[in-house]
């Protein structure tokens, strides 16, 4: 069963418009192609509204302001500079991956099909950090005192756009 903020919001929208909606779990980098080839009717998956994506699909008005955050083991790293030469997990095909590759090429990005898998590898010491949506990783911090934010929130609109929207 798929759970989370986006699913809860999508279910509320479906109820509001009296529609029967089905949900599927897909790799993030397959979402826009699935929409373009009409395998799905809408995508609601924490997707940043960026100029690059707006060239491919339409978006609703943003439903959530977005930022990103690095997370690592508690007490190990306090600044992003300390992650130079380290392995940081990202969800494959996301703006987080592009941001690190462009702005922090000295950090080794490790792509994952889901943030949950990146989180597991972080907790088990296979990677040094994860870079993801602030809303997602903040929940991890609440649930796991062994994890901590590394540096400040990142709000670069060139990468994280004008917020999260529903792609249609």
Describe each model-derived feature in a short phrase.
Residues 18-20, 36-45, 87, 105, ...:
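Alpha-to-beta junction loops
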Residues 1, 10-19, 96-114, 141-145:
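Ligand-binding cleft/hinge of the Venus flytrap
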Residues 64-71, 134, 141-168:
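Periplasmic-binding protein-like
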Residues 13, 35-36, 83, 122-123, ...:
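Hydrophobic residues within well-ordered alpha-helices
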Residues 60, 72-88:
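Flexible hinge/capping segments at coil-to-helix
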Residues 1-46:
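Extracytoplasmic small-molecule ligand-binding "clamshell" domains
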Residues 7-8, 22-33, 75, 110-124:
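Short helix-initiation/N-cap motifs at beta->coil->alpha
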Residues 1-8, 81, 155-158, 168:
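Short, solvent-exposed loop/beta-turn-alpha elements that line the ligand-binding surface or hinge
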């Amino acid at each position: 069963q798929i759970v989370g903020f986006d699913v809860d919001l999508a279910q509320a929208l479906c109820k509001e418009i009296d529609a029967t909606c089905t949900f599927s779990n897909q790799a993030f980098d397959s979402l826009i192609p699935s929409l373009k080839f009409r395998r799905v009717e809408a995508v609601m998956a924490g997707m940043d509204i960026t100029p690059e994506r707006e060239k491919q699909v339409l978006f609703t008005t943003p439903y959530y302001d977005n930022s990103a955050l690095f997370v690592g083991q508690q007490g190990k790293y306090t600044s992003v500079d300390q992650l130079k030469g380290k392995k940081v997990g990202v969800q494959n095909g996301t703006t987080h991956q592009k941001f690190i590759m462009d702005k922090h090429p000295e950090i080794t990005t490790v792509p994952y099909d889901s943030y949950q898998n990146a989180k597991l590898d972080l907790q088990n010491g296979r990677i040094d950090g994860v870079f993801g949506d602030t809303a997602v990783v903040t929940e991890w911090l609440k649930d796991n005192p062994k994890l901590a934010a590394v540096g400040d929130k990142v709000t670069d609109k060139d990468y994280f756009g004008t917020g999260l929207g529903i792609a249609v």
